[in-house]
Amino acid sequence: MGDVLISDRPPSPARLSHTSEKHPRVTLQELNVLRRHRELCDVVINVKGRKIFAHRVILSACSPYFRAMFTGELEESRQTEVTICDIDENAMELLIDFCYTSHIVVEESNVQPLLPAACLLQLAEIQDICCEFLKRQLDPENCLGIRAFADTHSCRELLRIADKFTQHNFQEVMESEEFLLLPVGQLVDIICSDELNVRSEEQVFNAVMAWLKYNVADRRQHLAQVLQHVRMPLLSPKFLVGTVGSDLLVRSDEACRDLVDEAKNYLLLPQERPLMQGPRTRPRKPTRRGEVLFAVGGWCSGDAIASVERFDPETADWKMVAPMSKRRCGVGVAVLNDLLYAVGGHDGQSYLNSIERYDPQTNQWSCDVAPTTSCRTSVGVAVLDGFLYAVGGQDGVQCLNHVERYDPKENKWSKVAPMTTRRLGVAVAVLGGYLYAIGGSDGQCPLNTVERYDPRQNKWCAVSPMSTRRKHLGCAVFNNFIYAVGGRDDCMELSSAERYNPHTNSWSPIVAMTSRRSGVGLAVVNGQLYAVGGFDGTAYLKTIEVYDPETNQWRLCGCMNYRRLGGGVGVMRAPQTENYMW
């Protein structure tokens, strides 16, 4: 045998590092067993005669309230039984259970005592869960009660949401019994808001008078105080004179008559209006419905998916909504008449020609839309002149140049002129009355060519090509340019991006995205350009980035719930329901 080589360096000690994932869970479980058996317990919490055995160290670790009680100089630090008043005994037991189990169920029957108890014990996580539960329960009948509850317990985020909900749904809230029971101060807080969502100021006046007449004897003294927040100069002259001015309660109060006279002067003396501006002449800003982004279907974890999620830029939250009835990757998505259409795609086994339509007001998909004449995946979909166009794609046999359009009034598809080039993984955009088909693949190699369709002539013609071949790219119209981002060329996924100027018929580069993205969705939401998901050559992506044209920079801005390759994106106005306000 040959010589054994021995290093001069001393051998490093053997080492195996281990962190147990089950240890914390098992430890907590055993501590709870000890508590249930009243073993090693060193304190009893007495709430209205109910005695709850516990360990000081566990309560102190979970609750700043208990930590201050047991580690300070308070008398309770030396007591084996501590009495706590002004708290619900069932809520206390639930919270101590949570300290030992990390589990709690919040429901309608316990949330009202549970929230103040969590506030007392300074259990911020439970406070947040209670507030989230109440946010989900908001409706026009209870929002004022929830608002008062949030105000009492200093839940500022819940108070903000309840205020926003009340303002947004004032037309329904004013008809509730809770509205009629409001104290005068809370009524004033509501009606003085610029954000009150009303069709006209007449609704505000009618709401105030309904509140007043619910208890005239006690409330007529507050009439002028309340009416000064009704913007009478914005009433119609007919309503001001015929309804407000003739009301006996208004006529019997001098301060109210002065408010009516002020409004009459504003209406009758237009030349004097610049000198009469004030809070009562300022139009309210109805709660604007911002835009939200939907990410639809795609490919995730080796399979097509049916899931759909919605992004609200105001909160930067992604929320799951109703899934489609079929799994769809390579799906074409567009919005027509405030409805979201999902066209074609592939379900993991078959190429599809079926279509689904989503109504955000009901959070439901319907399948009563006529199918396309051809099965299509990797299809481009866009809306032009009230028609939904399906452009290119593949049907499982060949790459397509077919184009057809859908008439929602007739629920019917009809073919229009085909493209000059077959294109799958094509991006489409509408600008200046034309439908653009950008890039894609002809079935052999990626394309940089671009053609546009003129519906007036039913004809396609070529425009300037992109600088880069791209298939499965993202495309959107932003500030009167067509942006093309990501995709894949002959050999790799792309992060590069460029934009098309229709006035000069030319493409120019912009800064690359932070990630390579093929199968990326691109959309403009509330004036910002978002790139959604895709594939970077190694992994499916759920990250989102947004482009700032002023700085020519992309920045990451959160993640979807699902990784998505080849999903569709669509942008809609947020529905006027509480489900879409957060």
Swiss-Prot record:
Kelch repeats: 292-338, 340-386, 387-433, 435-480, 482-527, 528-574
Lineage: Eukaryota, Metazoa, Ecdysozoa, Arthropoda, Hexapoda
Residue ranges occupied by any BTB domain in the UniProt entry: 41-108
Entry-linked CDD domains: BACK_KLHL20 (cd18459), BTB_POZ_KLHL20_KLEIP (cd18249)
Superkingdom of the organism of origin: Eukaryota
Function: Probable substrate-specific adapter of an E3 ubiquitin-protein ligase complex which mediates the ubiquitination and subsequent proteasomal degradation of target proteins. May have a role in synapse differentiation and growth.
Annotated GO biological process: negative regulation of synaptic assembly at neuromuscular junction; proteasome-mediated ubiquitin-dependent protein catabolic process; protein ubiquitination
Associated pathway: Protein modification; protein ubiquitination
Protein name per Swiss-Prot or TrEMBL: Kelch-like protein diablo
Region (Disordered): 1-21
A GO cellular component entry from the record: Cul3-RING ubiquitin ligase complex
Keyword field: Actin-binding, Kelch repeat, Repeat, Ubl conjugation pathway
Gene3D superfamilies: 1.25.40.420, Kelch-type beta propeller (2.120.10.80), Potassium Channel Kv1.1, Chain A (3.30.710.10)
